[in-house]
């Protein structure tokens, strides 16, 4: 087996992986969350992670059909992972602001709520929920 130090850091096998479960505030640490729950995001998707990484200038690839091993739900919403390049060919960092995988995860979790797809969803869903709350759900039996 080849030593990982022998391969160049820019080799695609040396990219870091970010699964949505790493950033999900609905997961426990045992279920795969890797950042503090106060900084985690509600149900992030691999596409959102890739959008944030690409926007900041990181080299990121989306792998849609990959699944996190601890994810029990096989739904399409929970599939995917993102490969992110941290180091260049010579071993130097691609971006100085991201020295580690944890710094990338914290930045992505901070930026996902600011995405246009997130802000539009939350604004449009509130009026629909408020309309349905006024109805009663049937009668109970009277006590004698």
Swiss-Prot record:
GO molecular function, one term: 7S RNA binding
Subcellular location: Cytoplasm; Nucleus, Nucleolus; Nucleus, Nucleoplasm
Superkingdom as given in the UniProt entry: Eukaryota
Keywords: Cytoplasm, Nucleus, Ribonucleoprotein, RNA-binding, Signal recognition particle
Biological-process GO terms, alphabetical: SRP-dependent cotranslational protein targeting to membrane
Record keyword RNA-binding present: yes
Listed GO CC annotations: nucleolus; nucleoplasm; signal recognition particle, endoplasmic reticulum targeting
A family per Pfam: SRP19
NAD among keywords: no
Annotated spans, Disordered: 118-144
Biological role: Component of the signal recognition particle (SRP) complex, a ribonucleoprotein complex that mediates the cotranslational targeting of secretory and membrane proteins to the endoplasmic reticulum (ER). Binds directly to 7SL RNA. Mediates binding of SRP54 to the SRP complex.
Family: Belongs to the SRP19 family.
PANTHER family: SIGNAL RECOGNITION PARTICLE 19 KD PROTEIN (PTHR17453), SIGNAL RECOGNITION PARTICLE 19 KDA PROTEIN (PTHR17453:SF0)
Subunit (UniProt): Component of a signal recognition particle complex that consists of a 7SL RNA molecule of 300 nucleotides and 6 protein subunits: SRP72, SRP68, SRP54, SRP19, SRP14 and SRP9. Interacts with IPO5, IPO7, IPO8, KPNB1 and TNPO1. Interactions with IPO8 and TNPO1 may be involved in SRP19 import into the nucleus.
Protein name, UniProt field: Signal recognition particle 19 kDa protein
Gene from which this protein is expressed: Srp19
């Amino acid at each position: 087996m080849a030593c990982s130090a022998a391969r160049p850091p820019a080799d695609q096998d040396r990219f870091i992986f970010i699964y949505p479960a790493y950033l999900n505030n609905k997961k426990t640490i045992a279920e795969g969350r890797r950042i503090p729950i106060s900084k985690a995001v509600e149900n992030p998707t691999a596409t959102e992670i890739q959008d944030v990484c690409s926007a900041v200038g990181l080299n990121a690839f989306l792998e849609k059909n990959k699944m996190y091993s601890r994810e029990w739900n096989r739904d399409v919403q929970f599939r995917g992972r993102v490969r992110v390049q941290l180091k260049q060919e010579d071993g130097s960092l691609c971006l100085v602001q991201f020295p580690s995988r944890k710094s990338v995860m914290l930045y992505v979790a901070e930026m996902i709520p600011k995405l246009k797809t997130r802000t539009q969803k939350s604004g449009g869903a509130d009026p629909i929920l408020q309309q349905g709350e006024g109805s009663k759900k049937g009668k109970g039996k009277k006590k004698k």
